[in-house]
């Protein structure tokens, strides 16, 4: 006899569960965990690009400027811009004949 016929049997043209222990706290906890797992799996599949991009890059938004005077912030911005400008000068033009 299969497990299916032992647990679920036709009752009045419907399928019902003959488990008398369905109010057991372990069964209730397992059901809740199963439902939560299914919900999390569906959300993961729907939003996996956003979720893993967040994990990969984190919440990095640059160094904190809290408590730093405005003049030093401006100096830092200029240094960063100069570094970007210096990198732009490294490109080499190659002409093919």
Swiss-Prot record:
Q: Where is this region: Disordered?
A: 59-84
In the UniProt record, does the keyword Ubl conjugation occur? no
Give the Gene Ontology MF terms in alphabetical order: monoatomic ion channel activity; proton transmembrane transporter activity
Alphabetized UniProt keyword annotations: Disulfide bond, Glycoprotein, Host cell membrane, Host membrane, Host-virus interaction, Hydrogen ion transport, Inhibition of host autophagy by virus, Ion channel, Ion transport, Lipoprotein, Membrane, Palmitate, Phosphoprotein, Signal-anchor, Transmembrane, Transmembrane helix, Transport, Viral ion channel, Virion
- Report biased composition (Basic and acidic residues) as residue ranges: 71-80
Question: Which top-rank group of organisms is this from?
Answer: Viruses
UniProt site (Seems to be involved in pH gating) = 41
Q: Which GO terms describe its cellular component?
A: host cell plasma membrane; membrane; virion membrane
Topologically, how does it sit relative to the membrane? Single-pass type III membrane protein
Per the UniProt entry, what are the Gene Ontology biological process annotations, in alphabetical order? protein complex oligomerization; symbiont genome entry into host cell via pore formation in plasma membrane; symbiont-mediated suppression of host autophagy
Residues that bear Phosphoserine: 64
Entry-listed glycosylation sites: 20
Sites marked Essential for channel activity, possibly by being protonated during channel activation, and by forming the channel gate and the selective filter: 37
Q: Which residues lie on this side of the membrane: Intravirion?
A: 44-97
Residues with a covalently attached lipid (S-palmitoyl cysteine): 50
Activity regulation description: The M2 protein from most influenza A strains is inhibited by amantadine and rimantadine, resulting in viral uncoating incapacity. Emergence of amantadine-resistant variants is usually rapid.
Side Virion surface, residues: 1-22
Where it sits in the cell: the answer is: Virion membrane; Host apical cell membrane
The domain-related comment in the record is:
Cytoplasmic tail plays an important role in virion assembly and morphogenesis.
Protein family according to the UniProt entry:
Belongs to the influenza viruses matrix protein M2 family.
Role noted for this protein: Forms a proton-selective ion channel that is necessary for the efficient release of the viral genome during virus entry. After attaching to the cell surface, the virion enters the cell by endocytosis. Acidification of the endosome triggers M2 ion channel activity.
Additional notes on this entry:
When the channel is activated, one or more imidazole moieties of His-37 probably become bi-protonated.
Name of the featured protein: Matrix protein 2
Query: Which lineage is the organism of this entry classified under, starting from the top rank?
Result: Viruses, Riboviria, Orthornavirae, Negarnaviricota, Polyploviricotina
Q: Which gene encodes it?
A: M
């Amino acid at each position: 006899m299969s497990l299916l016929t032992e647990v679920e049997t036709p009752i009045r043209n419907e399928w019902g569960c003959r488990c008398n222990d369905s109010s057991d706290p372990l069964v209730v906890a397992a059901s809740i965990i199963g439902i939560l797992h299914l919900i999390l799996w569906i959300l993961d599949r729907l939003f996996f690009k956003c979720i893993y991009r967040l994990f990969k890059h984190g919440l990095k938004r640059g160094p904190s400027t809290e408590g730093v005077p405005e003049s030093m912030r401006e100096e830092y911005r200029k240094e960063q811009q100069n570094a970007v400008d210096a990198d732009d000068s490294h490109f080499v033009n190659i002409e093919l004949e």
